[in-house]
C-alpha cells in the first residue's frame, strides 16, 4: 500500500472544494454568477457557454505541460493531449466546412489579439505595412490602431499601419477609397475584420484589392465566427489567405483563439506557368510556438473541442438564426422609437446606437444601464472625438439568445434602453453646473437616490432571472 509523505492537512488541502478551501473567492464568484443571472447581458463580445464546456475547462487537462505540437512535443506523457489537440483541429475544420488538403488550423493561441500578432509576425518583417479598419470606424485595436500623436496598439510599433474607414454618411466601408489608398500604400497585409461594424464585409472586393497590390488577405472573424460556422452569413474562407477568430464570442466556446491558414497552390507564375505554393503553415505555427508562446492551455483546447462539436449541430444553427432575428428586432424597435443606428441597421449579431441626436454620450447611458442590470458598452462611432466619452453604445444579442430570448423580448430590451436614454437626459439636466462632469453623473446614478433607477433595477432583475444560466 502506498504511503503519503505529507501531512493529512496537506492532503485535505488538495481535495477540499473551493467553498471549503477559499470561501472569500467562492463568495465573489457567487456574486458574479448572481450578477449574470439577474442581468440582461448585451455586450456583443460576450456569450454564455455550455455546462459541457465548463466541465472540460475546469479539468485535470490543465495539469499537463506540452510545448510543441502533436507528435513533436518537448515533454513526455502527451499521448492523450495529442489526441485532444488533433480532435480539436479536425472539429475546427469540420465546423467551417473546410477541406484539410486546403486548410490547416492552429488551436493553441491564447486569445484573439495575440493570434493576430502571431499572424503578422509570421507574414511580415518589422516595419512592413498593414492596413486595417480604423478603431472608431468599427475596427479593433489589434489591427494596428494609432492616433495622430500616439501609437496605441503594439502592432503599430512593430509594423507600419494605415487605416481604412467607412463612409461617414452611410456607415459602410468605403471600398473605393480603400482601394485607392492600398494602391499607393502597398500593404503586405490587408485585414478585413471588425469589432463594432454591423454590416457584412464584401470579402470578394477585399480579395480583389489584396490581389491588386500583392497583399495577403487576413480575415479576423472573431465576432461573427459562430454565425459563419452555422452558415447564416457568408463565409470568408473562399477569399482569405488567413482567418483568425476568438472562440468565446458567437462561437460560444472557452476564451481562446484559432488561426486558419491556406495550404496548397497560391497562384501560378504567368511567365513560367509554375505553381507557387502557400508557405503559411510552418511560419504561423513557428510564430505561435516557440515565437510568442510556450506551453498551450490544454484545458482550453479540450473545452474548445467540445464547443466545436456543438457548433456543427442543427441546434447551433437554430441558435445563430435566432441571434440574427433578435438583432433585427432591435433594429426595428429602435427605429420605431426614433433612434439613429450607425449604418442604418444590422446584418449581424449587434446594433450600434448613435446617441448624438439625443445630445448624450455612451459613457453616461452605459452607466445608467449598468445600474438597472443591463450590461452593454459605450463604443466609438465614426466622427467621435474621444474614446473615453464616445457617442455610441454597442448592443449584442448572442448571450441573451443563448439564454432563450426571442424577438419580442429584444423589443422589450430596446424599450428599456429608450427609457434609460430619456432618464439620462433628465438626470444630466438636473445636475448643477459646477458638478456636471461624467464623474458627477456616475456618482449620482450610483447613489441610490434616483427612484426610477431603483424601480427599473428590480423589474429587470426579476425578468432576467426567469432565463436559465448554465453554471
Swiss-Prot record:
The keyword Cytoplasm applies. Pathway: One-carbon metabolism; tetrahydrofolate interconversion. It is found in: Cytoplasm, Cytosol. One of its GO terms (cellular component) is mitochondrion. GO terms for molecular function: glycine hydroxymethyltransferase activity; pyridoxal phosphate binding. Its EC number is 2.1.2.1. Keywords: Cytoplasm, One-carbon metabolism, Pyridoxal phosphate, Transferase, Virulence. Transmembrane segments: none annotated. Catalyzes the interconversion of serine and glycine. Essential for viability and required for virulence in a murine model of established pulmonary infection. In eukaryotes there are two forms of the enzymes: a cytosolic one and a mitochondrial one. This is Serine hydroxymethyltransferase, cytosolic. It comes from Aspergillus fumigatus (strain ATCC MYA-4609 / CBS 101355 / FGSC A1100 / Af293) (Neosartorya fumigata).
